[in-house]
């Protein structure tokens, strides 16, 4: 039994650009939110703030994992796209 894979390199490239844009936007938004939260920390100091900070730090940890995994997938997809382009141009 042979298996076949159908790949559209243009669609892969579009997706790569979309995920890169998403990651850039996510990082920018995260940096702004970090700054705002640090500024607020001087005036919001109760149990709810501590709970929020714990949840927020966990979210940042998960987002960092997603970012790292996405970077790995981008590398793979870039290689796959290039192989498909090479194959299609031969």
What are these regions (language model features)?
Residues 1-90:
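N-terminal secretion-targeting helices of virulence/extracellular proteins
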């Amino acid at each position: 039994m042979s298996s076949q894979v159908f790949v559209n390199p243009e669609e892969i490239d579009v997706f790569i650009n979309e995920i890169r844009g998403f990651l850039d936007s996510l990082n920018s938004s995260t940096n702004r939110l970090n700054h705002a939260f640090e500024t607020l920390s001087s005036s919001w100091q109760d149990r709810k703030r501590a709970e929020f900070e714990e949840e927020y730090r966990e979210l940042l940890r998960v987002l960092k994992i997603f970012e790292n995994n996405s970077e790995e997938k981008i590398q793979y997809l870039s290689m796959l796209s290039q192989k498909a382009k090479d194959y299609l141009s031969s």
